[in-house]
Amino acid sequence: MNPLIQSLTEGQLRTDIPSFRPGDTVRVHAKVVEGSRERIQIFEGVVISRKSQGISEMYTVRKISSGIGVERTFPIHTPRVEKIEVVRHGKVRRAKLYYLRALQGKAARIKEIRR
């Protein structure tokens, strides 16, 4: 990578990110701006993918809300995310869990592991 680009991105990388992988259940505290005020909205779900590396790294979280699947994609190093909590670790054998979109109910459960 170009040394100039690398020096610019190093200052913007966050160090308070816990280690999590696809299959883990996370609680994301995201800042939401509504008009002139700002509040924190918690989005809890299963991580179904992690993409890229460095400053452009992203992850997708999926949850079921009122029987409808909702997915949100967040950049790892964004200041819009207050914090990320790992609720539990799941045992999966894939890097991308897009097959969970077709499953519902008990079939969409992920076995928990101790880490």
From Swiss-Prot:
Keywords: Ribonucleoprotein, Ribosomal protein. GO terms for cellular component: cytosolic large ribosomal subunit. PROSITE patterns: RIBOSOMAL_L19. It comes from the Bacteria. One of its GO terms (molecular function) is structural constituent of ribosome. One of its GO terms (biological process) is translation. Signal peptide: none annotated. Pfam families: Ribosomal_L19. NCBIfam families: rplS_bact. Belongs to the bacterial ribosomal protein bL19 family. This protein is located at the 30S-50S ribosomal subunit interface and may play a role in the structure and function of the aminoacyl-tRNA binding site. This is Large ribosomal subunit protein bL19. The lineage of its organism: Bacteria, Bacillati, Bacillota, Bacilli, Lactobacillales.
